[in-house]
């Protein structure tokens, strides 16, 4: 089903988004870019699509998707000859796989740069794997004869997007089938959305410090060395006269830290740290039960949700202002049902 513009609204299947007078999508949802074929758009070279159920069925209540098909964006029709990446010397070009004449590298690069320059408002991007325009990693690259391909490339659109917006969470549809990668991607888009909201409301040192404080436990679960380094950067915020410049650097460092997948060991350390807050409130049986759940998670016999659920119960019973504000316990809407399987 094709997209259409109707009276200022962008209609895509069951999704409707309001456009403002400049054409930008306005929504209360989190803005996320996506390869159009992943929403079920019949825009692929063969007239098909690669509908991603996770995006369409699970993320859509929370996310305002902004679909792009770079190959149609440069004027190619549907259907069309397949494209592929070709390496000649040190240069990689985008060409038709049926060997017809035509180097699409420059036009695709120009289109990708124009698009990327207007996407700073996005909080994430989901791209189509293996695509010579959109693939994020391990895209096939052929030699000049169309042979000897190696899975070593990146699609031109995604390459430009990631170099222009290096802080932006980008993932492929295939990788999002991995529960931990899926969880990490959702976590990052929510963290960036909240950070962008602070800038929209007017940057202050206090607001940035409060934001960082809310994310401390979550950051600790990702990387202890990077957590400490980012903490030193935040402590030095008073040395920056230009808060916009500070925001740009903080955003890059924060999103780089969150891109590290959290480890079981780091999660265990965070859980044990939080356990210490209830040292005086819990009786012996309760302390033993909590310690047993944390150890069960450490040994992979309990999912992360088990100790977190018990900790949240104790947080409600014995309120602590610092813990109640920590995004570690609620990094995304509970209805997304992440953290359930590990």
Walk through the language-model features, giving the residues of each:
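Short, hydrophobic/glycine-enriched beta-strand segments
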Residues: 31-38
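N-terminal glycine-rich phosphate/adenylate-binding segment common to multiple enzyme folds
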Residues: 111-144
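Positively charged N-terminal leader segments that act as targeting/secretion signals
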Residues: 1-11, 23-24
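Divalent-metal-activated hydrolytic enzyme cores
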Residues: 93-111, 121, 147-214
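N-terminal glycine-rich anion-binding loop in soluble enzyme alpha/beta folds
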Residues: 42-43, 47, 51-93
